[in-house]
Regions:
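Specific aromatic-rich, kink-prone transmembrane helix
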Residues: 114, 134, 153-177
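Hydrophobic, aromatic-rich transmembrane alpha-helices
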Residues: 274-307
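Transmembrane-helix motifs of polytopic, lipid-linked glycan transferases
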Residues: 98-122
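Signature aromatic-anchored transmembrane alpha helix within multi-pass, membrane-resident enzymes
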Residues: 20-24, 126, 218-222, 345-391
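Hydrophobic/aromatic-rich transmembrane helices and adjacent perimembrane loops
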Residues: 301-365
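Perimembrane helix-loop-helix junctions
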Residues: 191-221
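Start-transfer (signal-anchor) and selected internal transmembrane alpha helices
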Residues: 1-32, 171, 213-217
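Extracytosolic helix-loop segments that constitute the early lumenal/periplasmic catalytic or substrate-binding loops
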Residues: 32, 50-74, 82-83
Length: 500
């Protein structure tokens, strides 16, 4: 039996250990942040509860019926994300919404490995540290972690792996990594379409078969998008439509997060880009994440579908750069676009010294000082942007995330609702009540055939807009003909049980 080549093993270890360490550091920081959020009772929206109900259903091999969205609501008719079924076994082992937060942190951290590894090949270990941490702690990834779990976290490592494969001209691997995006969210089929066009353009010198392959892949992306939004989503949506239209007036856009969703006319192209001004800030931060020069890479075109539906929409939160989860898909695209440009800058010098593009050696070749200085200069831009914007990003608030003094009272309210019960609640304990229970949100439960057995209210929840409420009277008023009695009241948490 032939022994492994020690030199080959050493090269593999050298190319992997530092990117892995960077990813682990980023992941540990994000997990620490998520746990701190959890202990501080921070609830940005109802979304974590929604996804917890969906994944809980998957863990039981059931359709993702999510009562939080409404009685009998199939979440596959909201956004199309069947890939979340893969999280069912994990949730079955660890049935908690906190599990989803940790899974998201791990997926984001995993995306750091290919990006940092490519940076290491191009710029050495210093480049891996610089690009790896600037990417891993990037604006959109921090925003996703701060906004808590969403389906797009699955897209982040896929985009990172696909982007690195594009830079290295491994077209088959690039297409394989990106194909599952059509199962993550419906609009990502358009991102796959743009990837096909980018592959076609970059591979045009390889002959007609390469061009046809790229065009076929682009066709796959556009067909997947059309089939999803025209057939699959309407078939599973209770209203028989695609729930998220550009004007924000469709059935799915309004969530208890704040922000206007009023329908309006589609604005002019100039207004789409510049009004309100926060759009310009988002574009600036995105370009900085690509070192500005990354915008010249054909890979950067993958940001266009996401920016198009966001900027053309009328929901205020679509435009922001500092706190929205859908920015996450832009960050790996920008990082890989930057590395693509750096790779092209340094490629002639590497070729001159006989360097192989796919070498596992972490030591960079020795191009001219000017090219290398330019590469380092643009590689520093994302880190500089991160430093400038850090105080506006979620991790800056980490020192303030201390355990809520009402945690014991919150746990008491949870314990008052037995497993197997149906319960209606506001946002504060929404996700925490999901394991083993049928959970409804107070804003979507009006069409229930049978009122919930329990009502749980946090009088301090933003869901009430400062109004004075209690579980007993609210439950009786919301469900005429039925009465509730208070069985738990402590530190603003109220639990009422249905008595008739």
């Amino acid at each position: 039996m032939k022994r492994p080549d020690r030199l080959a093993v050493g090269r593999v270890v050298a190319s992997w250990w530092l990117p892995t360490v960077i990813a682990c550091a980023v992941g540990a920081l994000y997990v620490f942040y998520s746990v701190a959020q959890w202990r501080a009772l921070v609830v940005p929206s109802w979304d974590l509860g929604i996804f917890a109900e969906a994944v809980q259903a998957y863990s039981r091999f059931e359709a993702p019926i999510v009562p939080i969205k409404g009685p009998g609501y199939n979440l596959l008719g909201d956004h199309f994300h069947p890939i979340l079924a893969l999280l069912g076994p994990v949730y079955r082992l660890f049935p908690s919404a906190l599990t989803l937060l940790v899974v998201q942190d791990v997926l984001i951290a995993a995306s750091v490995v290919p990006v940092a590894r490519l940076a290491q090949r191009l710029l050495g270990r210093g480049g891996a540290l610089l690009v790896g941490f600037a990417y891993g702690l990037g604006w959109g990834l921090q925003g996703a972690v701060g906004a808590q779990f969403h389906e797009v976290c699955v897209a982040v490592p896929l985009l990172a792996l696909g982007g690195v494969a594009f830079v290295e001209r491994r077209w088959g691997a690039c297409m394989a990594w990106l194909a599952p995006l059509v199962l993550v969210k419906e609009d990502l089929g358009l991102t796959v379409f743009m990837a096909g066009l980018a592959i076609t353009w970059r591979g045009r010198s390889e002959g007609r078969p390469a061009v046809l392959r790229g065009l076929a892949y682009a066709l796959f992306g556009i067909v997947a998008f059309v089939v999803t939004v025209k057939l699959l989503l309407p078939a599973m949506n209770p209203a028989g439509t695609w729930a998220y239209s550009l004007d924000g007036s469709a059935t799915g856009a309004g969530t208890p997060m704040g922000g206007s969703t009023a329908a309006r006319e589609v604005p002019s192209p100039w207004a789409v880009l510049t009004s309100p001004p926060v759009k310009l800030a988002t574009l600036l931060v995105l370009l900085a994440g690509a070192g500005f020069v990354g915008a010249s890479s054909p890979w950067f075109a993958l940001v266009l579908p996401t920016l198009a539906w966001r900027f053309a929409g009328s929901v205020d939160t679509y435009y922001v750069w500092d706190s929205w989860h859908y920015n996450a898909v832009l960050v790996p695209i920008a990082a890989c676009s930057l590395l693509d440009v750096i790779n092209r800058w340094l490629a002639p010098e590497r070729a001159a010294v006989g360097d192989d593009t796919d070498s596992e050696n972490d030591a960079p070749a020795s191009p001219t000082r000017g090219r290398r200085a330019g590469a380092w200069a643009v590689a520093c831009v994302p880190a500089l942007s991160l430093a400038i914007t850090a105080s506006a990003l979620p991790l800056w608030q980490l020192p303030t995330l201390t355990e809520d003094p009402r945690m014991a009272a919150a746990q008491g309210a949870l314990d008052a609702v037995p497993e197997g019960a149906s319960v209606e609640t506001d946002t504060t304990l929404l996700a925490r009540l999901v394991p083993g229970r049928e959970v409804y949100w107070v804003g979507t439960s009006g069409t229930m055939d049978t009122p919930p057995e329990y009502v749980v209210i946090d009088v301090r929840s933003y869901a009430w807009g400062g109004q004075q409420v209690d579980a007993e009277s609210w439950g009786s008023a919301a469900h005429p003909g039925h009465t509730y009695e208070t069985i738990y009241s402590k530190a603003g948490f109220r639990v009422a049980r249905r008595t008739s």
